[in-house]
Amino acid sequence: MHDKVLRVLLTCGARILDLDYETTERQDEWMILDTIAASAKERVAAAKEALPLAEQIARARELDSNTGFPFEQALAKKRMSFICEVKKASPSKGLIAPEFPYVQIAKEYEAAGADAISVLTESAYFQGKNEYLTKIRQTVQIPLLRKDFTVDEYMIYEAKNIGADAVLLICAILSPMQLSEYAGIARELG
């Protein structure tokens, strides 16, 4: 079984459901992933109408590269690194933080020694906002990961423009070709 899991991690082309984990719980997890990914595609379509891809790309390319930024360094340390998460809600827990002082939370993470901060920007299921990441970026010096359901290259350029140093790519919702393309764009942007 270990070989099968390793194959999934390396190819990112198979789903856990294909590996004999046919439980109702797993099926529910995949259904919510697919639902959130579909919602993300709708958000991207609306965002492209407000700010076309070409403009998002131009803005992102004007920004400095983050190559060599502490995000890579944080993950390469010989000690265990930790990334703290700023999250208002989740599909499984519902509303986690009705009062949501996200900037204060980020400051406290940085003061406590976090190596990076993951900021949820997915709005429909996690009640995240791009604004959270932008305002946190203005406040802390440590690297920021935009945690969203990246389903289009547009979201990578947008992430750079709102202040992210890294993006989350979820293998289960991307084809191997998309994963390779999106990782390349992220590397190009630094």
Task: Give residue spans per PLM region.
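An N-cap/entry alpha-helix motif that binds or orients negatively charged groups
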Residues: 30-97
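Catalytic beta/alpha-barrel core
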Residues: 117-126, 143-151, 165-176, 190
